[in-house]
A protein has these predicted regions:
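C-terminal motif of bacterial Sec signal peptides marking the signal peptidase cleavage site
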Residues: 13-16
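Surface-exposed acidic loop/strand-edge motifs in secreted or periplasmic proteins
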Residues: 36-141
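Short, solvent-exposed mixed-charge patches
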Residues: 178-179
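Short beta-strand segments that buttress and anchor functional surface loops
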Residues: 53-55, 149-154
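Sec-dependent signal peptide recognition
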Residues: 2-8
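Short, exposed beta-strand-loop hairpins at the edges of beta-sheets
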Residues: 151-170
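Bacterial signal peptide processing site
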Residues: 18-21
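Acidic, negatively charged sequence signal
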Residues: 27-28
């Protein structure tokens, strides 16, 4: 009887010390990202609301939604970025073969979206010169004069989008797009 009891105790201890289920260890614990902040953008005397949401449970189905609303609540910019596109257009040296790494990568993009260096005050400096990455030279010159602020965000490894408010056209436009 003692031998049987000893065998049961040792077996129990042995099983308790086994590592957990590998699939369970690789499971991704992810919460949707929902952040917002206010900054002057369309008007130097008012605060617009910048909002980002990262929704979805699997990287291929995730969507990063970014919008800007004027102080009065009117939406002036809205873009949806697919998680699969963000993953596909990244540094080829970055190993994103595992779903867990893809989720971490997308969450990092969302968490860093409102980094201070993405807010450009002003969007264009008076001494700046338009180059081949400026899609709208008229807007670029308008921004030099208005001194309105800009915002940049990344679409991929070498694809940054710079946006600003055009007082003349009363809408947000891309004023620079490059590396």
């Amino acid at each position: 009887m003692r031998k049987l009891l000893l065998l049961i105790i040792i077996s129990t201890l042995f099983l308790a010390c086994q590592p957990g289920n590998k699939a369970k260890d690789d499971a991704v614990n992810f919460k949707n990202v929902n952040q917002q902040m206010t900054k002057s953008f369309s008007d130097l005397n008012a605060q617009d609301t910048f909002k980002i949401e990262l929704n979805g449970r699997k990287p291929e189905n995730m969507v990063l939604v970014f919008n800007i609303k004027k102080a009065g609540g009117k939406e002036i910019y809205h873009v949806q970025l697919k998680g699969s596109d963000l993953i596909g257009d990244t540094d080829p040296n970055l190993d994103l073969s595992k779903e867990k790494d893809q989720m971490t990568f997308l969450k990092t993009i969302a968490d860093n979206f409102f980094a201070e260096d993405n807010f450009l005050e002003p969007a264009v400096l008076p001494e700046d010169k338009a180059d081949n990455y400026v899609p709208d030279k008229v807007l670029y010159e308008e921004l030099k004069k208005s001194r309105l602020n800009g915002f940049k965000y990344r679409l991929g490894k070498e694809n940054n989008v710079y946006i600003a408010w055009s007082e003349k056209e009363q809408k947000v436009k891309i004023y620079y797009k490059c590396c």
